[in-house]
Amino acid sequence: MLKITLIYPFSADLKDKSIFRFPPLGLGYIAASLKQKGFNVELVDYTFLNNNEAAKKVRDSNPKIIGIYSMFSMKKKSLELAKQFKKNDILLIAGGPLPTLDPADFLKDFDIVVIGEGEVTIIELLNSVEKGKELSMIKGIAYKNQGKIIINPPREYIRNLDELPFPSRELFDNQSYKDYYLKRFNHSITPIISSRGCPFMCDFCSSPVFGKKYRERSPSNIVDEIESILELDYDRVWFADDCFTINRKHLLNICAEINKRGLKINWECLSRADTIDEETATKMRQAGCIRIFFGIESGNDKILALMKKQITKNQAKNAVKTAKSAGLQVGAFFIIGYPGESDQTILDTVNFASKLPLDYLSFTLPYPIPGTALFERVKEKINFPSDDWEESKNWSFIRHKLLYDAGFSEKKLKFAILKAHLQFYIRKFLGKKGYRLIGMPIQKISNFIFVLMS
């Protein structure tokens, strides 16, 4: 059988505590599918290795095929690695969100791009390569033929996710991931998914690009995998679904299965403000959910409508209150500087966010992902070449790039983010009375400064 080495080109300063590091779950699924069919697979994860150490591992694996994962923050690194390992006798394959959205760009440095879900496609592809067959009949790939780019018909979505083998977690550097979290947060966490796809059409999100077809794993299959994770000595899982709480019945069945088996596991998830009620939040807490994150995005209903979020700020406020009442820690994500924003809508969001009883909040600037509606609206205003879209190696809340002409300066938007965090922490640590004495004067002065900034 062919030897394939999968590469996860993550790179960041290990001293930066603001960065969440998770093993490459997608490559874990690919590896498991390949191993199930008898292929020899290795995985090289750059997360805890320097470039020389990782490159040596790749060379020592002596692969005939190299598969490199890429997303928006990894583009430069993935292209550098393609050039580094390119040899006449090595086939280079790209996969992941960014190659899926722009296969032609990656075919400048790669031989083949796997588009979308790759578990079935990679098996057919490697079988064809091994037998010297044509690539024209393989769905879900792009390649070059005599210099011409060929994009084959799309692969159908995998309907029954229970048929997929669990990710090959034995290939992950589990000890390094556990140590990283234990030293910083006193717990060890690793990702899992209960579903794929998202039926919503948020303006800025790449999920609709990959399809709106929402598919679920069975609760028993999910909890079987949680048990296997516990055997690796993790004590927490992160449900990496686009929205874990979409299907209330499915969610409650997962909670019931966890409780039925008596599992001692804490977990976290992403949610939408219109998918949480009191009973659901309480059942989640009883089943080990410790933290929930909402993509609230804006504190202005007009901007929420422009984003196609299909929620209101009142729904967001109630969702946070409901989750907190159930004993959950709550985090929220916000975007400022969106097309159509004004000084007032940004201040609405900043002041709304800082008033919510959150445990964590995160602000970012708009990120125009290729293929999204947001990208189509602003693509003529983009100021950076796509190769330079990576965040700074220091991914603190104030170091985001403004990638296009938003009508606001990057400096002004970063001031708004700083203002939001300052107001939030004053309220969090000094309470309402302290905020009235200290926070309100700061809020009024910073509002005035923000409006005056260009």
Positions of the model-derived regions?
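Active-site charged/polar residues at nucleotide-handling catalytic sites that mediate phosphoryl
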Residues: S61, L232, L356
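Glycine-rich beta-alpha loop elements in corrinoid/cobalamin-binding modules
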Residues: L2, F20, G26, I30-N160, ...
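N-terminal [4Fe-4S]-dependent radical SAM core
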Residues: F10-A12, I138, K144-S194
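C-terminal accessory regions of radical SAM enzymes
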Residues: L2-L14, A142-N145, I149, Q329, ...
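Radical SAM [4Fe-4S] cluster-binding motif and immediate context
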Residues: F22, P167-F333, N351
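Short, solvent-exposed turn/loop segments enriched in Gly/Ser/Thr/Pro and often Arg
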Residues: T47, L98, A240-N247, R272-A273, ...
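Catalytic cores of alpha/beta
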Residues: A104-K108, T280, G340-S354
